[in-house]
Every structure is written in structure tokens, then in C-alpha cells.
């Protein structure tokens, strides 16, 4: 929005041209989202406490979690508000990729909001009926997928980028829609499963979003895209602003979510952030990098799949409890140790992912 204001004011003072620089707007988007999140955080927490929107805890979970019962949840609303405000202020709103990203973010946030609200009002951890939850997640993902395909059909925006192989970039055709669906829905649920400890999900989300900001910038720059042997996608540069807004809002939320947490993001936050990472990965054509950089999310999801599959087939559990962060808790690891070690692993995986951009 302010891009247009800057363009208008340039005729009166050339210094306003600085607003046109993507790097400047990215930094300002990060700071705006951070400050908005820090500003509204205490207000949101107080409001959630007054409404008695407290977290419900699994009865079969670690005993250390019983003390978390009643901690305000649905704090993800402040993350979404900060990201949306910052993106609308600093992104070029004529860019369709910005709107696809906001559509998935807010659409998944709405589903998460309903899910959280049902858990709170029913005083259990069930929430939305699974089939309806996945139905609406699928509807939003498919609407976004068809729209993205319509814009990028038969261009580099619908090619598959394979790590380590610069010559292998097949045109996906309609398979692009299927891949987009699974990436968005899968990432959303993976982040949701990871959000089980104080700050566990938000820091990997911040790290991956920060990495995607760099990738989006390179993908939207014809010279860097050619240098890295990745597709040049003209609309992708504006995603830098969206990604840095996620970083800022995430860090602001972590201020209140760090152990011991004053507020939890709830499904309204985790589903939305996961969906946002998924749609960005698709738009910059780096789905494989998302698997690498978001390795913590992948492992958490696989631990649940393996646990359920093993129990159904062999009536035996692989882990003491799934997702895997609970397994380490039941082994005696203090919660902060689990959290920080997962953060370190996430940072390492993000760096590995960024390195693979050049290893082609």
C-alpha cells in the first residue's frame, strides 16, 4: 500500500524512492510486524484470560503439561493480525502472489479459530470433526492451487525444481495442482503437530520463513536466479515482504510464548503459519527445500505416522509418545532442553537447505 504512496510522493521529493526498494520494505515489514505483535500481545492475552479461553491438555500426556491447563490459547490471532497489517502496508498489493499467500494464511487461520473455539467451549481436545477440518483445508488449498496454476501455466512458475540437478526442471502441468495441494495441507498439519511445547513451533517457522525471504529475493532477481540456476519468477520478489512479516510477527509472539509460556498460538496460529510456509514454498518453486529446511516438522509428522501405523499393524508403539517431542519429555528431558535442541536442529537444516541452492 505504501509503495503506491511512495511513488506518488516521489514527484515532490526523490527521497521517497527508497520505499520502492524491496530490501527496505522487507526490513520495515519485519519491524512493523514485530512491534505490532509486541504492542497487542498483552492486550490479547488479557482478553483471552477474561474470556476464559484456556488451553485443554491431553489426559494421557506428560504430567509436566498438566500445569499448562488454563493457559490462554488462540494467541495466533495476534500473529495473523501483525502479518496481515505489515504485509498490507509494505507489500505491492498489485502482486497476485501476495494475495495468494494472505488467502491461505487467513483462510487456514479461520479454520484454526473454529477448531480452537470448539475445543474451548467443549472443554476437550477434540475440536472440529476431522473430516470437516480436512474438507475446508482442502477447499482453500485447491482454490489457491487452481489460481496459482492459472497465472503461471506453462511457464517457469510451474516447473519442478530438483535439488542438486540444475538441468532437471520438468514442466508439471496439471500435476502442479496436486503437488500444491499436498504441500499446503501437509505443511499446515506438520506445523500443527509440532506446536506442542512452549516456543517449539514458532522458532523453526521463523527460521524457515527467513530463509524463504532470501530465496524469494533471489528467485525474483533475474541475475541471481541465473547465477543459482533456479527459475526466475517475476512475482516472487514481493514474497520477501510477506516472509519477513512472518519473521517479525513470530519473534513478537515468541516474546510471550517462550518457556514458561504466557500464551499458546493454538490451531489458529499453527495451521495458518504452516499453510503460509507451504504456499510460499510452492510459489518460489522450492518444495524440496521446504522438506529439508522444515525437517523438524517432517520428523514430528513421521513420528505420528509411524506410531499409529506400528500400533495398528503390530499392537506395539515405537515411541513412548508421539509426536516425538513428547517421547523425549517422557525420557526425562526437561522441556526447555527439548525446545532448544529442536531449534538448533532447525537452524542447521535451514543452513543445509540454503547451501543446496548452490550445489547444482
UniProtKB/Swiss-Prot annotation:
CDD domains reported for this sequence: GT_MraY
Keywords: Cell cycle, Cell division, Cell inner membrane, Cell membrane, Cell shape, Cell wall biogenesis/degradation, Magnesium, Membrane, Metal-binding, Peptidoglycan synthesis, Transferase, Transmembrane, Transmembrane helix
Keyword RNA-binding: no
Catalysed reactions, as listed in the record: UDP-N-acetyl-alpha-D-muramoyl-L-alanyl-gamma-D-glutamyl-meso-2,6-diaminopimeloyl-D-alanyl-D-alanine + di-trans,octa-cis-undecaprenyl phosphate = di-trans,octa-cis-undecaprenyl diphospho-N-acetyl-alpha-D-muramoyl-L-alanyl-D-glutamyl-meso-2,6-diaminopimeloyl-D-alanyl-D-alanine + UMP
InterPro entries: Glycosyl_transferase_4, PNAcMuramoyl-5peptid_Trfase, PNAcMuramoyl-5peptid_Trfase_CS
Coiled-coil parts of chain: none
Entry membrane topology: Multi-pass membrane protein
Cell compartment(s), UniProt: Cell inner membrane
EC numbers, comma separated: 2.7.8.13
Stretches that traverse the bilayer: 21-41, 73-93, 94-114, 132-152, 168-188, 199-219, 235-255, 263-283, 288-308, 338-358
Domain of life: Bacteria
Function, in words: Catalyzes the initial step of the lipid cycle reactions in the biosynthesis of the cell wall peptidoglycan: transfers peptidoglycan precursor phospho-MurNAc-pentapeptide from UDP-MurNAc-pentapeptide onto the lipid carrier undecaprenyl phosphate, yielding undecaprenyl-pyrophosphoryl-MurNAc-pentapeptide, known as lipid I.
Similarity comment text for this entry: Belongs to the glycosyltransferase 4 family. MraY subfamily.
Xref: PANTHER family: PHOSPHO-N-ACETYLMURAMOYL-PENTAPEPTIDE-TRANSFERASE (PTHR22926), PHOSPHO-N-ACETYLMURAMOYL-PENTAPEPTIDE-TRANSFERASE HOMOLOG (PTHR22926:SF5)
Protein name: Phospho-N-acetylmuramoyl-pentapeptide-transferase
Native organism: Pasteurella multocida (strain Pm70)
The gene coding this protein: mraY
